[in-house]
């Protein structure tokens, strides 16, 4: 597996348009205050006089003309139709079906990449719940809603993690009492505190995930083998230890796909809807508390 890091200086078409649009906004605000510098000994203070902007203040025609083409292009992109959903996808912490949907799509995309690039399947996918900011509601889903749900520029990443650290990963998930997940079924017991929680049973999906049906009808039969490595789909925030996933920093190899998670969600939502005219509500239990 190669450690492929994308050129972060290279902007996508959508990113370029956004940056130019924001530049135009900054130009508007640049005329909203005046400053002067006052020096005292070696220290320089900047005094700003703010100018209130009301509806009565006329628009700047040059700024409007500058922004107009980028604004029109962005509005067209944000209104792009993706799919239609029949049931809500909630951002309930740890256990929401929005997280299960996103993790499913991460695994489906990651498996296609891992088979093509490395000749082996991706075993499972996890995400951090903090990457989602709202949910989906019944009705049409547009690109604008995807930006509202996932506003961050995290990308899909594949990590090759030794089994001993995979064990630590599942132990941490037990302490969290769940996380967006796909490709495994796990139970955990509660201790006096969350740090005392322990995962009790774990079964990994025994089949490669090549289709939506593989996701919806998994074969949870494989136990964890700490003597081997696992290929896991995560995001670029988690791979550097974000949200406490520090065990991922022990990955033997890391493959940055260069694909934004929002793009993954858009592509897979569209594919599932075009195939089935329906988005499964993802009500399947994947991580659950084992009563004592």
Regions found by a protein language model. Give the residues of each.
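N-terminal secretory signal peptides that target proteins for export/translocation
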Residues: 1-14
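Sec-dependent N-terminal signal peptides
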Residues: 13-25
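C-terminal motif of bacterial Sec signal peptides marking the signal peptidase cleavage site
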Residues: 28-31
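Feature captures C-terminal
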Residues: 34-55, 100-103, 107-292
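Start-of-domain marker
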Residues: 41-77
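Coil residues (strongly favoring Ser/Thr
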Residues: 56, 61, 84-88, 168
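Acidic/histidine-rich, surface-exposed loop or edge segments in extracytoplasmic proteins
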Residues: 76-93, 245-251
């Amino acid at each position: 597996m190669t450690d492929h890091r994308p050129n972060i200086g290279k902007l996508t078409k959508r990113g370029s348009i956004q940056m130019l649009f924001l530049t135009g906004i900054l130009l508007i605000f640049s005329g909203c205050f005046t400053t002067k510098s006052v020096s005292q000994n070696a220290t320089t203070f900047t005094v700003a006089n703010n100018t209130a902007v009301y509806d009565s203040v006329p628009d700047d025609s040059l700024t409007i003309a500058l922004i107009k083409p980028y604004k029109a292009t962005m509005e067209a992109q944000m209104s792009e139709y993706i799919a239609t959903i029949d049931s809500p996808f909630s951002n309930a912490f740890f256990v929401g079906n929005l997280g299960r949907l996103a993790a499913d799509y991460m695994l489906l995309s990651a498996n296609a990449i891992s088979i093509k690039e490395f000749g082996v399947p991706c075993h499972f996918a996890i995400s951090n719940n903090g990457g989602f900011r709202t949910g989906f509601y019944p009705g049409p889903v547009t690109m604008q809603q995807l930006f509202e749900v996932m506003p961050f520029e995290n990308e899909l990443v594949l990590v090759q993690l030794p089994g001993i650290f995979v064990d630590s990963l599942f132990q941490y998930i037990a302490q969290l009492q769940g996380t967006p997940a796909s490709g495994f079924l796990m139970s955990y017991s509660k201790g006096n505190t969350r740090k005392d929680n322990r995962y009790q049973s774990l079964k990994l999906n025994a089949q490669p995930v090549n289709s939506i049906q593989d996701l919806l009808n998994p074969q949870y039969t494989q136990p964890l083998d700490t003597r081997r490595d696992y290929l896991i789909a995560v995001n670029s925030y988690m791979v550097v230890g974000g949200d406490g996933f520090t065990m991922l920093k022990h990955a033997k190899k890391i493959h940055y796909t260069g694909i934004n998670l929002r793009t993954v969600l858009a592509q897979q939502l569209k594919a599932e809807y075009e195939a089935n005219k329906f988005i499964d509500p993802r009500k399947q239990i994947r991580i659950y508390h084992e009563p004592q």
